[in-house]
Amino acid sequence: MAKNYYDITLALAGICQSAHLVQQLAHQGQCSQDVLKTSLSSLLDLNPPSTLAVFGNQEANLQFGLETLLAVLNSSSRQGLSAELTRYTLSLMVLERKLNASKTALHDLSSRIEQLDRQLAHYELDSDILLSAMAAIYVEVISPLGPRIQVTGSPAILQNTQIQNKVRATLLAGIRAAVLWQQVGGGRLQLMLSRNRLVNEAKSILARLDGTPT
């Protein structure tokens, strides 16, 4: 069966978007609220009609992730911020496989997300209450699966509880995107064997957003 590289690229961009948000939060203590909301919202749509629907049905919602994806695929750097992005992205993929292998964790995650959905009736998605709840899901359901993702950045920033919660909530969103990536036919071998297909697909989507003919 032929792979749908459009869906695969969108889901992969979702992973990369979360990875880059984590990096920005850890180093700068801030990130785009709109981009963050796109990633966090993806946690609540577990039965989407399409891959794009997970991210609000707008390709523009993944522009940040698509640009990050190109940076990751085109990078040969083994050091610095680029290497950090690649490490976060690959670590999320590894954790997703651990999650997929644990029926208990999958059940726990599903029930906790349902609780989260109910809380959304009373609180804003990016409220401290919901960010704390999402962070708790990551710490209690995902982290024990191991290996833990070591987030690096400014020690002063990373000691801030609100930043810690945002980072963990964003990592949880990255796991959601990694689950989606597997569901639409994604796999780590593609990063090497189908790199050009992924690059071209990402460039094509970005060109549409810019209004540039492809």
From Swiss-Prot:
Official protein name in the record: High frequency lysogenization protein HflD homolog
Disulfide bonds: none
Principal cellular location given in the protein's record: cytoplasm
Compartments it resides in: Cytoplasm; Cell inner membrane
Alphabetical list of PANTHER family matching this protein: HIGH FREQUENCY LYSOGENIZATION PROTEIN HFLD
Assigned protein family: Belongs to the HflD family.
Pfam families: DUF489
InterPro entries: HflD, HflD-like_sf
Cytoplasm as UniProt keyword: yes
Coiled coil feature spans: 81-130
Organism in which the protein naturally occurs: Erwinia tasmaniensis (strain DSM 17950 / CFBP 7177 / CIP 109463 / NCPPB 4357 / Et1/99)
Gene3D superfamilies: HflD-like
UniProt key word Cell membrane: yes
Domain of life: Bacteria
Topological category with respect to the lipid bilayer: Peripheral membrane protein
GO (cellular component) term, any one: plasma membrane
Keywords per UniProt: Cell inner membrane, Cell membrane, Coiled coil, Cytoplasm, Membrane
